């Protein structure tokens, strides 16, 4: 199912959406933070999706618990370190970990630049102990408004040498992409790549805007592109990558069922698309789960799954030499 001769990657993976249950428990107790359960065993249902529970509100509430225990910069560094460990232990050869320093900082009023530095330090420490390649993507969380995103951008750009790209995430309907055109001009001026959450809650126009105005060369989720034939043609022609996260889309009610997921439609249209975990801590999944789902529920053949793996390597924010090195390590 997973082709071991091809690098296994996860490109849409939120660091702040992957905090271990035991880490939430330990940090909560360490910092005197009230948790919704009185034992480690009973905490899981409050911070991870259980069974077929699918609602965006329930999903986001679980995500809030993950950042709610980030009471100091040591906690941030620990979570970053554990993200590297989790990526390696799930069999990934390469992962791009994205994070919103404003979101991670806000509960306990941490310094945004300090959060970025703690993430960088935690990842560096993890890379000393685990054999996996990691790059970082900074997120601007649109839900908090333009001014907050300016603060976030400045904190991230202070450490731009440790980032490969910037992302726009959050409330796509309430805060459309055009509000952040100036922010992403600064991102382009900093020579960082751009991806954006688009076409998830809003329609295809949100994706057009992200590509044409923000400068996105990849789109997170993008499920609503399938209703716009011209956009589908454009995505295929210009090799705009779709970072697909089927289980997350189910958990947030972006799609009603796996059978309704448009992954197959993208593939048949020749669009560059890959598989990702999104918030693996909340969804309680790993990349292997997504490949199993792609085979059993999305009905992809082994040959198609191998193509999806190759797509991920092509889509990655890597140099050609780094891509070749990933393949060489699999021989």
From Swiss-Prot:
GO terms under biological process: adenosine catabolic process; hypoxanthine salvage; inosine biosynthetic process; nucleotide metabolic process; purine ribonucleoside monophosphate biosynthetic process
Pfam families: A_deaminase (PF00962)
Cofactor binding, note field: Binds 1 zinc ion per subunit.
Metal-binding recorded as keyword: yes
Top-level lineage group: Bacteria
Metal-binding among keywords: yes
List of catalytic residues: 200
Record keywords: Hydrolase, Metal-binding, Nucleotide metabolism, Zinc
Top EC group: hydrolase
Cofactor requirement: Zn(2+)
GO molecular function, one term: 2'-deoxyadenosine deaminase activity
InterPro entries reported in the protein's UniProt record: A_deaminase, A_deaminase_dom, Ado/ade_deaminase, Metal_Hydrolase
EC number from the UniProt entry: 3.5.4.4
Record's function text: Catalyzes the hydrolytic deamination of adenosine and 2-deoxyadenosine.
PANTHER family reported in the protein's UniProt record: ADENOSINE DEAMINASE
NCBIfam families linked: aden_deam, PRK09358.1-1
Full protein name: Adenosine deaminase
Upper classification of the organism: Bacteria, Pseudomonadati, Pseudomonadota, Gammaproteobacteria, Alteromonadales
């Amino acid at each position: 199912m997973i082709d071991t001769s091809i690098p296994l990657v996860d490109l849409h993976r939120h660091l702040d959406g992957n905090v271990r249950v035991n880490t939430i428990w330990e940090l909560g107790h360490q910092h005197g933070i009230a948790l919704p359960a009185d034992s480690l065993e009973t905490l899981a249902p409050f911070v991870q999706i259980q069974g077929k529970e699918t609602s965006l509100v329930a999903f986001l509430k679980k995500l809030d618990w993950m950042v709610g225990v980030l009471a100091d910069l040591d906690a941030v560094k620990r979570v970053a370190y554990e993200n590297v460990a989790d990526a390696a232990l799930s069999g990934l050869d390469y992962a791009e970990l994205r994070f919103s320093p404003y979101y991670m900082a806000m509960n306990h009023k941490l310094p945004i630049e300090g959060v970025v530095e703690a993430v960088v330090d935690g990842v560096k420490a993890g890379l000393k102990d685990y054999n996996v390649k990691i790059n970082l993507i900074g997120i601007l969380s649109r839900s908090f408004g333009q001014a907050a995103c300016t603060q976030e951008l400045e904190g991230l750009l202070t450490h731009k040498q440790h980032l490969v790209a910037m992302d726009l995430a959050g409330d796509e309907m309430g805060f459309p992409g055009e509000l952040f055109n100036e922010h992403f001009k600064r991102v382009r001026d900093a020579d960082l790549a751009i991806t954006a959450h688009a076409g998830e809650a809003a329609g295809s126009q949100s994706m057009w805007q992200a590509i044409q105005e923000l400068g996105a060369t990849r789109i997170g989720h993008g499920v609503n592109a399938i209703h716009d034939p011209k956009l589908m043609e454009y995505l295929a022609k210009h090799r705009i990558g779709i970072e697909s996260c089927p289980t997350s889309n189910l958990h947030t009610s972006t799609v009603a069922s796996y059978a309704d997921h448009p992954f197959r439609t993208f593939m048949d249209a020749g669009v560059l698309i890959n598989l990702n975990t999104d918030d693996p801590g909340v969804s309680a999944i790993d990349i292997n789960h997504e490949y199993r789902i792609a085979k059993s529920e999305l009905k992809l053949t082994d040959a198609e799954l191998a193509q999806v793996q190759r797509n991920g390597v092509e889509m990655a924010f890597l140099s050609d030499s780094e891509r070749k090195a990933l393949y060489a390590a699999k021989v």
